[in-house]
């Protein structure tokens, strides 16, 4: 997961010595760590990562006059839900950097891989439920977040009279449901 890696990187200016981390398995939420790495570089970090390992050395923080932060893509599905449920006009200006999962939601795709975007599981499942249905995959790791996001999403769907089925790595969601 990117959160502990980002935390280590951003805390490393005060480290008394370098740290070498080995990573195992398939990485998840990789975009967030890359964003942390880029911001740290803008601020003076020489740290980098490669496949299977990250070497983190203490660094001197040198703040630039400004840092441009990317938009929070995970809020786009919320805007899409408001539009779908309440008939609000929605104009999306996506950028080349907009995540593949968000682009698949915008195109109303029947399958979405959330390996790098587990934050989208709940709004994506509702969009699929009120739309044509579909399958969310790559979300097995979301069971170990602040809550079990697969089970929490099922619970929330059921609270609104909708349903889905948990799979080993996500959800299968029937379409044409109404909250």
Question: Model segments located where?
Answer:
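Short, structured segments at the rim of ligand-binding sites
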Residues: 1-179
């Amino acid at each position: 997961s990117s959160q502990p890696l980002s935390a280590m990187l951003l805390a490393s200016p005060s480290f008394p010595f370098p740290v070498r981390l080995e990573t195992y398995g398939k990485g998840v939420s990789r975009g967030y760590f890359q964003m942390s790495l880029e911001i740290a570089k803008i601020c003076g970090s020489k740290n980098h990562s490669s496949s299977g390992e990250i070497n983190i050395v203490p660094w001197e923080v040198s703040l630039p006059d400004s840092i441009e932060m990317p938009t929070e893509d995970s809020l786009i599905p919320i805007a899409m839900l408001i539009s779908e449920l309440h008939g609000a006009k929605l104009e999306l200006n996506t950028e080349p950097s907009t995540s593949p999962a968000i682009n698949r939601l915008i195109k109303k795709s029947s399958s979405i891989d959330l390996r790098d975007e587990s934050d989208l599981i709940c709004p994506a499942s509702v969009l699929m439920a009120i739309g044509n249905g579909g399958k969310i995959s790559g979300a097995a790791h979301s069971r170990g977040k602040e809550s079990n996001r697969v089970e929490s999403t099922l619970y929330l769907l059921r609270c609104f009279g909708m349903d889905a089925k948990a799979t080993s790595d996500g959800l299968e969601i029937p379409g044409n449901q109404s909250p």
